[in-house]
Amino acid sequence: MTGTFLVTATPFICGNTVKGSVHVDNVTGTPEFTIGDPNSPNFGCPGNTITGSLHMSHSSVFAVESNTIGGSVLLDADTLELNGNISNGSLMCSDGTVILPGEPGDPTGNTVHGKNTCS
């Protein structure tokens, strides 16, 4: 995939290279939406390479795990599992973003090369 990837419905992004950024806006629901989650109890979803940034706004019930993100991760009023990712930019949480614990066996924490306001 090349360019900015705008998500407004249920995304399952597994094992892909996104040449650009991913934007997830106002997406909520069940089952859990997934942007990488190799240890999911329902199905394995390999992590992704996102060359740009990951932006999430007002979205919930997400797993974002084991991805390599070339830019920053910007989270605004979201609820999600966020584990085992590598961000070459910053990890920024705002407006009450909630980071949920992952399932047993999930990696813990994220590697962030810039500022981290989510801890």
Explain the meaning of each model-derived region:
Residues P11-F12, F43-G44, F62, L80, ...:
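A generic structured-segment signal
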Residues P101, T108-S119:
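Long terminal segments
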